[in-house]
């Protein structure tokens, strides 16, 4: 009854399907806890595996879970549907992916500016130098993080397909109604 009359708001859903509720007059005043022990925040399952499914053989060390970033951004922009998020270390593009997911869920128009360099890993740098390439050469730059991981992940998640053009498999967790990854954003 309190949900129906607006005293209590549904603010989310746990991995197990339990609704997260808050008194409407306290929304935006609650501080986050320092540890979120949530299955969907697993970097190996919803970071590394996610990247592998989108980017095939391309590698990125330690990507964050899209859901951990999504929940963090949602916490501070829940009532700011036109927020501008700036990610100064864009890495694998998780922040942009999370912003797009959040906008798709709540109809927001948040924007995300990604900033990153185009460095290559130490192993790739050695291999490229052994072949006579230097930073700035086309062969070097195409293996840099921005060109090889960040941008392709962003494009693939928006289009709903992997780097080979195949539809992404599965649904995004916690979305009601279910959002199919293959539908893109």
Question: What is each PLM-predicted segment?
Answer:
Residues 4-8, 155-163:
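Non-catalytic alpha-helical coupling and interface elements of nucleotide-dependent molecular machines
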Residues 62, 66-160:
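Conserved S-adenosyl-L-methionine
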Residues 158-183:
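Short mixed-charge
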Residues 31-33, 182-185:
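Sequence-level motif detector for i,i+2 pairs with an aromatic at +2
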């Amino acid at each position: 009854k309190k949900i129906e009359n607006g005293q209590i708001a549904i603010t989310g859903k746990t991995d197990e399907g339990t609704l997260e509720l808050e008194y409407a007059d306290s929304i935006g005043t609650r501080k986050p806890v320092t540890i979120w022990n949530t299955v969907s925040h697993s970097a190996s399952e919803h970071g590394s595996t996610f990247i592998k499914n989108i980017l095939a053989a391309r590698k990125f060390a330690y990507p964050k879970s899209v859901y951990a970033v999504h929940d963090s951004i949602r916490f501070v922009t829940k009532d700011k549907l036109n927020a501008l998020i700036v990610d100064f270390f864009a890495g694998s593009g998780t922040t942009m992916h999370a912003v797009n997911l959040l906008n798709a869920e709540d109809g927001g128009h948040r924007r995300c500016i990604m900033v990153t360099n185009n460095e290559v890993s130490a192993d790739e740098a050695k291999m490229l130098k052994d072949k006579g390439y230097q930073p700035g050469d086309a062969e070097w730059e195409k293996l840099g993080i921005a060109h090889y991981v960040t941008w392709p992940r962003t494009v693939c998640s928006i289009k709903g397909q992997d780097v080979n053009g195949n539809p992404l498999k599965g649904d995004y967790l916690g979305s009601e109604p279910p959002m199919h990854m293959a539908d893109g954003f």
